């Protein structure tokens, strides 16, 4: 597809999204309210969203992929409150299982296409799974969540270097890790 046609299609998708879908800020507002004052969860989702948005922008994602990525970054830990109550922890597998279902209901009134909701649900349902990464949105979500978790939890330099060298694929994500952790 030539660059002019691609640019035109991106503009059409963006115009449709602005008219019919919740904005990223509206999803953020809804997710913050859903978090019910849990400052740790709110700070984490904002941090992951910021890294995901930055990496996506720097990697030059098309408008639809960027939108799906940002919504997934905001909602990726939607199941944490339920997992704390139901299982007594926020184990990644429980988050993935519960989150994929929960995010569909959460986004049901946001005007997103079925394809967008399905992709967000897939990303939320796999955000702790580092194998079988099937798209740039998935890769960036994994990278953004890792950077946030590593900074919040004080991961060792060795752990960060290992993740960067074995899991990270985007140059922008690698550059952020190097800057954040002074590598």
Model segments located where?
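Divalent metal-dependent phosphate-bond-processing catalytic cores, especially two-metal-ion Mg2+/Mn2+ enzymes
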Residues: 1-18, 33-46, 50-62, 75, ...
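Active-site flanking loop/helix segments enriched in acidic
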Residues: 23-47, 79-89
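Generic hydrophobic secondary-structure packing signal
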Residues: 44, 48, 68-69, 95, ...
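An active-site-proximal "capping" alpha-helix that borders the catalytic cofactor pocket
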Residues: 48-51, 93-109
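Membrane-helix interface segments
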Residues: 63-65, 116
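His-Asp-centered metal-binding catalytic motifs of divalent-metal-dependent phosphohydrolases/nucleases
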Residues: 66-88, 99, 121-128, 145
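Short secondary-structure capping/junction motifs at helix and strand boundaries
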Residues: 111-118
């Amino acid at each position: 597809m030539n660059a002019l046609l691609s640019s035109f299609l991106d503009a059409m998708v963006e115009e449709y999204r602005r008219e019919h879908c919740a904005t990223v800020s509206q999803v953020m507002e809804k997710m913050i309210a859903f978090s019910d004052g849990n400052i740790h969860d709110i700070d984490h989702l904002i941090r992951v969203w910021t890294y995901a948005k930055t990496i996506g922008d720097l990697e030059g994602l098309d408008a639809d992929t960027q939108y799906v990525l940002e919504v997934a970054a905001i909602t990726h830990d939607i199941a944490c409150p339920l997992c704390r109550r139901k299982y007594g922890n926020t184990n990644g597998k429980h988050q993935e299982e519960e989150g994929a279902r929960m995010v569909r209901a959460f986004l049901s009134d946001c005007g997103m296409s079925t394809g967008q909701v399905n992709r967000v649900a897939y990303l939320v349902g796999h955000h702790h799974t580092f194998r079988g990464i099937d798209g740039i949105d998935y890769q960036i979500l994994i990278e953004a969540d890792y950077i946030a978790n590593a900074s919040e939890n004080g991961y060792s330099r060795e752990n960060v270097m290992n993740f960067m060298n074995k899991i990270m694929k985007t140059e922008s994500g690698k550059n952020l890790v190097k800057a954040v952790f002074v590598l």
